[in-house]
Structure formats: structure tokens, C-alpha cells
UniProtKB/Swiss-Prot annotation:
Belongs to the small GTPase superfamily. Ran family. The keyword GTP-binding applies. One of its GO terms (cellular component) is nucleus. It comes from Populus euphratica. This is GTP-binding nuclear protein Ran.
Length: 28
């Protein structure tokens, strides 16, 4: 899930974003 992905439903988006945060940090 990416922050600019507006079409996903919010609960799963938030869940996926929180899960991927460390990976996004490592990959920036």
C-alpha cells in the first residue's frame, strides 16, 4: 500500500501501510 493509493479501503490500507512502514523506510 502506497500513501498515494486513494482507491483502497481505509482499514486495510492503514493496516498494510503500518506493516510496510519499515520496508518503505529502508527502500527510500
Amino acid at each position: 500500500a502506497l500513501p498515494n493509493q486513494q482507491t483502497v479501503d481505509y482499514p486495510s490500507f492503514k493496516s498494510n501501510y503500518n506493516f510496510e512502514k519499515p520496508f518503505l523506510y529502508l527502500a527510500r
